[in-house]
């Protein structure tokens, strides 16, 4: 499923309308991966294929704007977070870039004070990743061919090293997200 694919517009257009309504009412919005792409497109930004599968634990960098953002403040500038996506997006007009990456630059952004998009999958744990590896085998083979087994092994090695730190990031952002929702709702 891709926000860049017009075939899914009958599903996505009502969601994007709801996202805009929430934003206009200052109700917090948090989009992760597909959700970040929907948020970007809701504000007329382009969503398009990355021409690669960004998969595995990836170094991401909190920007100057991110350092002072209420969800990210207090975190180390460099984070290693799980990724599994093949699309990316331009930033909507007026959005603040909060996190960036090397192969997919736009990793997290905020529009206004309550609408957030995260391209990375900070919400997943080892259990989720195991399922995604099994169910996403076709993607791994499509993008990596005979190297798919090595990519899978790399992901599993990375998991043992990074899943704990990634979980801390998730709890940090999640706690602050709950605070934001409590303030606004």
Identify the function of each model-found stretch.
Residues 1-30:
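Flexible gly/pro-rich beta->alpha loop and the following alpha-helix that scaffold active-site loops
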Residues 4-7, 52, 162:
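Pocket-edge positions in alpha/beta enzyme catalytic cores
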Residues 7-13, 34, 42, 93-94, ...:
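Generic recognition of short, well-ordered alpha-helical segments
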Residues 11-15, 47-48, 99-100, 134-136:
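Glycine-rich, phosphate-binding/catalytic loops in enzymes
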Residues 12, 16-20, 72, 174, ...:
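Short amphipathic alpha-helical segments and helix-helix/interface helices
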Residues 22-46:
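Catalytic nucleophile loop
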Residues 43-128:
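Pocket-forming structural segment of enzyme catalytic cores
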Residues 126-185:
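Acyltransferase
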């Amino acid at each position: 499923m891709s926000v860049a694919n017009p075939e899914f517009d009958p599903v996505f257009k009502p969601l994007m309308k709801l996202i805009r309504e929430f934003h206009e009412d200052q109700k917090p919005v948090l989009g992760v991966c597909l959700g970040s792409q929907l948020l970007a497109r809701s504000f007329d930004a382009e969503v398009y294929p990355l021409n690669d599968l960004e998969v595995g634990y990836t170094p991401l960098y909190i920007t100057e704007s991110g350092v002072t953002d209420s969800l990210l403040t207090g975190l180390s500038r460099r984070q290693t977070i799980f990724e599994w996506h093949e699309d990316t997006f331009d930033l909507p007009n007026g959005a603040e870039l909060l996190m960036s990456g090397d192969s997919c630059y736009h990793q997290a952004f905020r529009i206004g004070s309550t609408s957030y998009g995260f391209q990375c999958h900070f919400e997943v744990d080892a259990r989720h990743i195991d399922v995604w590896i099994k169910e996403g085998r076709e993607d791994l083979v499509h993008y990596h061919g005979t190297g798919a087994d090595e990519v899978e092994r790399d992901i599993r090695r990375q998991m043992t090293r990074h899943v704990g730190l990634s979980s801390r990031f998730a709890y940090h952002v999640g706690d602050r997200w709950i605070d934001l929702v409590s303030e606004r709702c």
